[in-house]
A protein has these predicted regions:
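Structural marker of alpha-solenoid helical repeat scaffolds
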Residues: 25, 59, 93, 127, ...
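Phosphate-binding active sites in nucleotide-utilizing proteins
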Residues: 299-402, 408
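PAPS-dependent sulfotransferases, especially Golgi type II membrane carbohydrate sulfotransferases
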Residues: 206-207, 219-230, 239-302, 353-384, ...
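Conserved alpha-helical positions within TPR/SEL1-like repeat arrays
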Residues: 34-38, 42, 65-76, 99-110, ...
Length: 540
């Protein structure tokens, strides 16, 4: 039991005496059950953890440490609302407890309450400044909320509290990348790998810098790691994707493609995606918005918003960076607010989108538009207009323009083979479950293409395409047309987009810090291996 307490103390930043105080009031039998549950939770053995906690709850149903672990277990099982309620009960029994606050913040964040999560993490760090986990969670949440400099400071504090905190070094690297400090980001990832050479996320994050090139030594290290029989599957997947980048970088394309197929197949087994059901959803959206919504005379609602919609890896970050280089535009990146407003209305009505669209009144759309503008108001604090490039927003263009009639929508497009191949190379942090087989990628691209073609056809005054290849060939003319469509005066700074200093929180963060690159196409390297993809996309 002492060894277990010592392990927890080192992990959390709380000393052994504090851990002993946490168990005050528990019998030796209950303490044993709590320790067993805690170990099982750490190892993600939820059935075992619940069995141990059931015994502890029978002996001490209102003990705060027992309830804290129950809340953590609920979180691990994905029952976030129950986790929040349980952790609030624990906090009522032990007010001002930093560890409970830290756990509560994690569950609030998982349930979508980012403001509540930040408040909990901030209070935890105030009460226990040595608690590395609270600083880490604070930094991670600040990063998600686009408060990037604050995130950096919190993550640096987490590392000061716990120099061996590998995950903090990885997320710090992500934050530095967003701030344009690519070399510092690489050093942070490399330091994480010095601490744990098998940290798959650190390897993939290093690969995901895009502008950094691996060498033969990196490729050999990754090959050895990939062959390790005892590697955790998540690490094996991350290392697999990183190995693809290393093999590409040293010109071994046949091996790279084989590794790419294997890494994607492993990831696909862990996610759920139903392509036919998604296609039927797109059918329903097309039927719900057969024509453009009416624009009320003189309406300016939503004039501040420029939606940049696309599939991943299609030039949307580059397009946003060009717009954000304009003196009138703030680049807000991938905001969750449009789908959140739509999903909230669906819950209120008890009908999934787009099932309620036919009964929505002009007043309903205006209300939803005002809700969106209230949620995103901070993005106009310094500049009058902002971009929103949420990855699922292409599905909601009809709703967005009904809500915000003066908004503009830019549809980013890239060669479909290059788009799908680039997505296939990308291990996404979350979502994009369609991207782990070429067949499902092709089906998703076809759904994107038919819906976005519909938007531009029915509403060309408010929806326009931005083609990546045209931007590469004619950067000044294409940029000029983009600005004109958005109602912006031409500014030469938009041609020097790579000089903009905003935080960029996507996989292309390092690339948009450089001038336009014309060497991003890679399909030619793989030859006949992509024939089935080309057929599925209808490009052969």
């Amino acid at each position: 039991m002492k060894a277990n307490k010592k392990r927890h103390a080192e992990h959390s930043g709380l000393d052994q005496a504090e851990w002993q105080r946490r168990f005050a009031g528990l019998t030796p039998a209950a303490i044993g059950m709590v320790e067993a549950a805690s170990t099982a939770i750490e190892r993600r053995r939820t059935v075992e953890a619940r069995r141990s906690l059931a015994g502890a709850l029978a002996l001490a149903p209102r003990h705060p440490e027992v309830l804290r672990l129950l809340g953590v277990l609920c979180h691990l099982e994905g029952r976030f609302d129950e986790s929040v309620a349980t952790l609030r009960d624990a906090l009522d029994l032990r007010p001002g407890d930093a560890l409970i606050l830290n756990n509560l913040g994690s569950s609030l964040r998982a349930s979508g309450d980012f403001d509540g999560a930040l408040a909990a993490f901030e209070e935890a760090t105030r009460l226990a400044p040595q608690l590395a986990g609270a600083w880490f969670n604070l930094g991670k949440t600040l990063k998600v909320r686009a408060r990037t400099e604050e995130a950096r400071r919190a993550l640096e504090q987490a590392i000061r509290c716990s120099p061996g905190h590998v995950r903090a070094r990885i997320v710090l690297g992500d934050t530095l990348k967003a701030l344009g400090e690519t070399q510092a980001a690489a050093e942070s990832y490399r330091e994480a790998l010095r601490l744990n050479p098998r940290a798959g996320q650190a390897w993939f994050s290093l690969a995901n810098l895009k502008t950094l090139r691996f060498d033969a030594t990196d490729a050999a290290r990754l090959a050895n790691l990939a062959a390790s029989p005892d590697l955790a599957e998540e690490d094996r997947i991350s290392i697999g994707f990183a190995r693809v980048k290393a093999l590409d970088d040293i010109g071994k394309y046949e091996q790279a493609f084989a590794a790419l197929v294997d890494a994607n197949a492993r990831k696909r087994r862990l996610v759920h995606w139903d392509a036919p059901t998604f296609s039927r959803q797109v059918d329903a959206i097309l039927a719900a918005f057969p024509q453009a919504s009416c624009v009320p005379a003189g309406s300016t609602r939503g004039r501040e918003v420029i939606f940049v919609v696309s599939l991943p890896r299609s030039g949307s970050t580059l397009t946003e960076q060009i717009l954000a280089a304009h003196s009138q535009v703030e680049g807000a990146s991938e905001l969750p607010d449009l789908p959140a407003v739509i999903e909230g209305e669906s819950r209120r009505r008890g009908v999934a989108f787009p099932g309620w669209v036919g009964t929505a009144t002009d007043g309903d759309w205006a209300r939803l538009g005002e809700e969106y503008l209230e949620r995103t108001g901070r993005w106009t604090a310094d500049r009058p207009r902002f971009t929103d490039k949420g990855l699922s927003n292409w599905q909601y263009v009809g709703a967005a323009l009904a809500m915000l009639p003066a908004a503009r929508v830019v549809v980013c497009r890239r060669d479909p083979v290059e788009t799908c191949l680039s997505c296939f190379h990308q291990l996404f942090a979350q979502g994009q479950e369609y991207s782990y087989t070429l067949a499902e990628l092709a089906a998703y691209w076809r759904d994107f293409d038919r819906l976005c073609t519909h938007w531009t056809r029915i509403d060309p005054g408010r929806v326009a395409d931005m083609v990546y290849e045209a931007l590469l060939e004619r950067p000044e003319a294409t940029t000029s047309r983009l600005l004109e469509f958005c109602g912006l005066e031409f500014e030469s700074s938009c041609l020097r987009f790579h000089e903009a200093t905003r935080a960029v929180r996507t996989a292309s963060a390092a690339q948009v810090r450089e001038p336009l690159r014309r060497d991003t196409a890679r399909a030619a390297h793989y030859g006949p291996a992509l024939d089935t993809l080309k057929v599925a996309l209808g490009v052969r």
